[in-house]
Swiss-Prot record:
One Pfam family here: Helicase_C
Family that this chain belongs to: Belongs to the DEAD box helicase family. DDX55/SPB4 subfamily.
InterPro entries, A to Z: CTT_SPB4, DEAD/DEAH_box_helicase_dom, Helicase_ATP-bd, Helicase_C-like, P-loop_NTPase, RNA-helicase_DEAD-box_CS, RNA_helicase_DEAD_Q_motif, SPB4-like_CTE
Transmembrane regions: none
Residue ranges of every copy of the Helicase ATP-binding domain listed in the record: 38-224
Name assigned to this protein: ATP-dependent rRNA helicase SPB4
Name of the encoding gene: SPB4
The UniProt record lists the keyword Manganese: no
Domain comment in the entry: The Q motif is unique to and characteristic of the DEAD box family of RNA helicases and controls ATP binding and hydrolysis.
Record PANTHER family: RNA HELICASE (PTHR24031)
Main subcellular location: nucleus
Native species: Candida glabrata (strain ATCC 2001 / BCRC 20586 / JCM 3761 / NBRC 0622 / NRRL Y-65 / CBS 138) (Yeast)
């Protein structure tokens, strides 16, 4: 018989104000992971929790922390200044802020007549320094700290911050916190905390952390795994894939945005610069070209934005009442809980298979229906589907690209794209940066048997970014050379990097709309022209005097060789002379040595003759 999911059936009584917070939030019953985790974590057990995305893991550790603060009597004025009771670590600022919001939503119902329970956010921002965070700890005396590893480590290194009262630690998205980019900081943080503490690790893919989980100071942990019928994705989440050429991806994205109904959609790109580039182009299509519906709100967020910008963008997306689309990177892939996200699109699969689940998990949360679609390039990338099946993730093909885009429509779309690029050289520069960044990203894919640079269609990929001329890159040079050797024709490539014939513009006359940038470009062009003339003159002089130069070099080489031979000859003569002197002084020893060898030879000869005579007997 399964564990009861009724809040009333917990084996201990929840605080009345926590019950009220649960009721106000609309959590009528517990999720399976909450029913399994809350009793364990609240009763002095270390836990390692693996559960599908959107299953309520945050509540599963927030309630035990609040309960323990009450039961341990931490909510009183005697709690020491500069101390804290619990620490929650998360890999991103966005997830940290979300956890802070969940804690705050519970504390809104905390009795005003009792000593307050407070939480503090400790994340890197341009607005606050580490010193400011320390002052907040000293002034407000929060019992709960929530933050990212880098900032928390700097924070804990302050002599004013005392760690001896820390009784509970949570690693949310633990597999990410234990990978190479965070592990050193996390390890240092855990080393300065008391060993006698409760530790909880939470993630949808904790198994990928392997043996590293044992380096977190766990003591007799309880492993809690909650899957949906043996699958690694919730049953309310429908996973789809669509196979197409790279150049068709953007056109399909716009088709979905214009024709498929959704409230909120998250679109994942590979790199920060790609988010910026496609955001600018989509805004152009919406405001100028009028081919993207005007009632759709388009927002972007990525890791290179300031904390304030990221926070504002995420808040706008979360609170928007109109149809809304968020262009982002994996910065918004883990743990972020945004209501009403009913569609997730991945323009390319992530480098890590675990990230695929985290991306998809932004929809289909809290038993709501969600759809997630990943775009795959034609060819080798189609093997990604059986690859994910091995990881218990079933993905069905969707008919979004069933009616293949006609060449005429594709050409028309591409020409409209290049028209935007041609309007300002800055657009082209951003396109090139996005293209190059994607190739670098692709080269670092963990599933190298599927995602190989040798199999990438560089020309079609260039058209996806609107490029009319490919940049010079070793990868592209090798790609073209391999095609030439095999006798294959590269469709859509017209030599010297051009993807359009005739070339749509003279690159020397390709201008920036920004006057300062254009002036700097013209100056640089003049300087390069002078340098190029000098190089050309030097090349011609070298060509004219090539035979003479060769002869001169040969003559010099001969002279140098003679000098070396003379020196070598003299060195040999000196060595011979020295040997002769040694021979004269050691004549007797040498003679004795020769005599000894002769005697040995004679003995061998006699022995051989004697052996022969014995054989004759």
């Amino acid at each position: 018989m399964g564990k009861s999911l009724e809040w009333a059936d917990l084996d201990y009584e929840l605080q009345p104000w926590i019950k009220k917070a649960i009721n106000v939030s609309g959590f009528d019953s517990m999720t399976p992971v909450q029913a399994s985790t809350i009793p364990m974590f609240a009763k002095n057990k270390d836990v390692v929790v693996e559960s599908v995305t959107g299953s309520g893991k945050t509540i599963a550790f927030v309630i035990p922390i609040l309960e323990k603060i009450i039961s341990e009597g931490i909510n009183n004025s005697k709690f020491k200044k500069g101390h804290f009771y619990s620490l929650i670590l998360a890999p991103t600022r966005e997830l940290s802020m979300q956890i802070q919001n969940v804690v705050s939503s519970f504390l809104e119902h905390y009795p005003e007549d009792q000593y307050p329970i407070r939480s503090q956010l400790v994340v890197g921002t341009n607005e606050k320094s580490v010193r400011d965070d320390v002052n907040t700890l000293l002034d407000e005396r929060p019992q709960i700290l929530i933050g990212t590893p880098g900032r928390v480590l700097d924070f804990l290194q302050s002599p004013s911050v005392k760690t001896s009262s820390c009784g509970m630690v949570v690693l949310d998205e633990a597999d990410r916190l234990l990978d190479v980019s965070f592990f050193k900081d996390v390890e240092k943080i855990l080393n300065v905390l008391p060993k006698q503490r409760r530790t909880g690790l939470f993630s949808a893919t904790i198994s990928s952390a392997g043996t590293l989980i044992f380096k977190t100071g766990l003591r007799n942990p309880v492993k809690i795994t909650v899957n949906s019928q043996g699958k690694n994705a919730p049953t309310t989440l429908n996973l789809f894939y669509s196979v197409m050429k790279p150049e068709e991806k953007l056109q399909n994205l716009i088709h979905i945005m214009n024709n498929i109904r959704f409230k909120k959609c998250i679109v994942y790109f590979s790199t920060c610069v790609s988010v910026t580039f496609f955001y600018q182009y989509l805004k152009y299509l919406q405001q100028t070209d009028k081919t993207l519906r005007e009632d759709l709100q388009v927002i972007s967020i990525h890791g290179k934005l300031t904390t304030q910008s990221r926070r504002k963008a995420l808040s706008t997306f979360t609170e928007s009442l109109s149809d809304c689309i968020l262009l982002t990177t994996d910065v918004a892939a883990r743990g972020i809980d945004i209501p009403d996200v009913d569609l997730v699109l991945q323009i390319d699969p992530p480098t890590d298979a675990d990230i695929f689940l985290h991306r998809c998990g932004r929809t289909g949360r809290a038993n709501k229906i969600g759809r997630a679609i990943v775009f795959l390039n034609e060819g080798r990338e189609e093997d990604y589907i059986p690859f994910m099946e091995v990881k218990n993730v079933d993905i069905e093909e969707t008919d979004i690209n069933k009616n293949k885009i006609s060449n005429d429509n594709n050409d028309e779309f591409y020409q409209r794209f290049t028209k935007w690029l041609l309007s300002d050289r800055a657009n082209y520069d951003l396109s090139v940066k996005s293209y190059v960044a994607f190739i670098r990203y692709y080269s670092k894919h963990s599933a190298t048997s599927i995602f190989r640079l040798q199999s990438l269609d560089y020309v079609s990929l260039g058209k996806m970014y609107g490029l009319f001329r490919l940049p010079r890159m070793p990868e592209i040079t090798k790609y073209l050379q391999d095609k030439e050797k095999s006798g294959e024709t590269v469709v859509g490539y017209y030599g010297e990097g051009w993807l359009m014939n005739p070339p749509p513009i003279d690159m020397d006359k390709y201008a920036y709309q920004d006057k300062k940038r254009e002036k700097a470009r013209i100056e640089e062009l003049k300087n390069l022209a002078q340098i190029n003339d000098k190089k050309k003159l030097k090349a011609e002089l070298k060509k004219k005097n090539m035979a003479w130069s060769s002869k001169t070099m040969t003559k010099e080489e001969r002279q140098e060789r003679r000098k070396k031979l003379d020196l070598k000859r003299k060195a040999i003569e000196l060595e011979i002379a020295a040997e002769a002197e040694r021979d004269e002084s050691d004549t007797e020893i040498t003679q004795d040595w020769k005599d000894e060898i002769l005697q040995k030879k004679k003995k061998k000869k006699v022995g051989s003759e004697m052996q022969g005579s014995f054989d004759d007997l």
